[in-house]
Amino acid sequence: MLNRMKSARPKSVAPKSGQALLTLGALGVVFGDIGTSPLYSLHTAFSMQHNKVEVTPENVYGIISMVLWTITLIVTVKYVMLVTRADNQGQGGILALVALLKNRGHWGKFVAVAGMLGAALFYGDVVITPAISVLSATEGLTVISPSFERFILPISLAVLIAIFAIQPLGTEKVGKAFGPIMLLWFVTLAGLGIPQIIVHPEILQSLSPHWALGLIVAEPFQAFVLLGAVVLTVTGAEALYADMGHFGARPIRVAWFCVVMPALILTYLGQGALVINQPEAVRNPMFYLAPEGLRIPLVILATIATVIASQAVISGAYSLTKQAVNLKLLPRMVIRHTSRKEEGQIYMPLVNGLLFVSVMVVVLVFRSSESLASAYGLAVTGTLVLVSVLYLIYVHTTWWKTALFIVFIGIPEVLLFASNTTKIHDGGWLPLLTAAVLIVVMRTWEWGSDRVNQERAELELPMDKFLEKLDQPHNIGLRKVAEVAVFPHGTSDTVPLSLVRCVKDLKLLYREIVIVRIVQEHVPHVPPAERAEMEVLHHAPIRVVRVDLHLGYFDEQNLPENLHAIDPTWDNATYFLSALTLRSRLPGKIAGWRDRLYLSMERNQASRTESFKLQPSKTITVGTELHL
């Protein structure tokens, strides 16, 4: 089995036209978050500590230098050049990295906890990104006229409501426009920055890291606090890794080096030059870069870009949740496909609803991008540090390469994280609270599922005893049905409770019994031809077949489709599901909060009928009461 699972990925390379389309697609999905960071990053830096950072050439050179070298070290070196090589059959993201490391001996438990924490922090990022992005875009209206300020909140809420309202429709059609629109956005960023650089070429001094180091030496505390704003320039860096499975590493690298990185460097240099020449522009340097006649079109384009950035992180939340469900970190949820062509385009009603409520509350509580900026950094930097630790465990390289990574990437990331801890009281509590809630949910689900499996194992009949009873004379009293029955089951050495009840209580015995166990592999996809392992446990008169179905964490758990590939005669089978009614052994008021939380999640998770893509008319649910 292991040899079969290690089949190499195809070495074929897409033709140049295909690579170009993938690169354009990556611009629309992967780089939306980091591409909209110039809307608020520099403004946030100068508004730190109630505008204590003076707008002087030295401070501007130092801040811009810190921004450019943070982008270079974390995004270019770490993600684009290094981490994207740590793929799991082409898939990326922190849970893909965790799946690669699951069996690393004594690291296993730490890796699982780190992956859970990283996923939880990502959800904090997902809640904040749509809110801060859309708010920062609509705040450009105040540059046109201060009287527009009262419209910022209603417009932002309307845009966000529209984003979440269209989720059930999917993005297959409008998604094709994301790439060209984001290409226009990055060209606009570069085009707005270049004139200011030409007029004030001295800003090019910021390319030298000595300005960043000089600011750190001259004003260490101020520089430390500024790191909390500098990190905003690399929000979305994790998307380069997480979305690798959709586009491939090469198109992402091409898009970064040819379009995104040059555009970001030019716009940050341009904003720095503008602020030196016009200190009042620090209120919103992105929109002050544009001539007055182009500011309304820029606000419109920026709003569209932030909608695309929001869509990217929402889609990322769906994908991450699906991985978490398949890895048994979360209960089953309803998953709906919104595209017949793209398997990865999905919609999850529960996730969408929770995100919608969370984002609305965040916007109404914080009310401005400046206030939200304080909340943003902790989720981002926490994920950065965790990915670095997991990456070092994965590569297990020579000591001097590890030392270089720690010095040039690890230490700066830890400093970025430490700087953001100073903002906990100003909003940094938000991602921490979100992460804490999700960790409690995931740990409770794991804990409760383990207890259920232990209790269930005590009720289930050992497989060998069941097979012995099939040959015993007293089975003549059973009503035999000349059809096929399929029993999904979690283990291979016991009999499903639904089958036990079927024989014991219903007195039914089917001509052919198929017991299906889904084996979750730590890879994104298992090729259809390599999924099934079948063993005939009992022949005539009752045929018992055990099927182990090996699926990746991105594969659909579609039982009829997968079983058809094994034996088309099973198409008309009747499916029997075990439905557990869970009760706590303790009275309601005494039962612990963990018991109550788990029981609530178990009762409200999506039905297995829908998760396994079964027809209700061909599915029978057999109930069993279980006391925990």
From Swiss-Prot:
Catalytic activity as recorded in UniProt: K(+)(in) + H(+)(in) = K(+)(out) + H(+)(out)
A cellular component annotation (GO) from this entry: plasma membrane
Keyword Calcium: no
Recorded GO MF terms: potassium ion transmembrane transporter activity; symporter activity
The keyword Cell membrane appears for this protein: yes
Topology in the lipid bilayer: Multi-pass membrane protein
Primary location group: membrane
Compartments, record wording: Cell membrane
UniProt entry keywords in alphabetical sequence: Cell membrane, Ion transport, Membrane, Potassium, Potassium transport, Symport, Transmembrane, Transmembrane helix, Transport
Spans through the membrane: 20-40, 63-83, 110-130, 151-171, 178-198, 212-232, 256-276, 296-316, 346-366, 375-395, 398-418, 422-442
Family according to the record: Belongs to the HAK/KUP transporter (TC 2.A.72) family.
Described function: Transport of potassium into the cell. Likely operates as a K(+):H(+) symporter.
Protein name, per record: Probable potassium transport system protein Kup
Organism: Corynebacterium glutamicum (strain R)
Lineage: Bacteria, Bacillati, Actinomycetota, Actinomycetes, Mycobacteriales
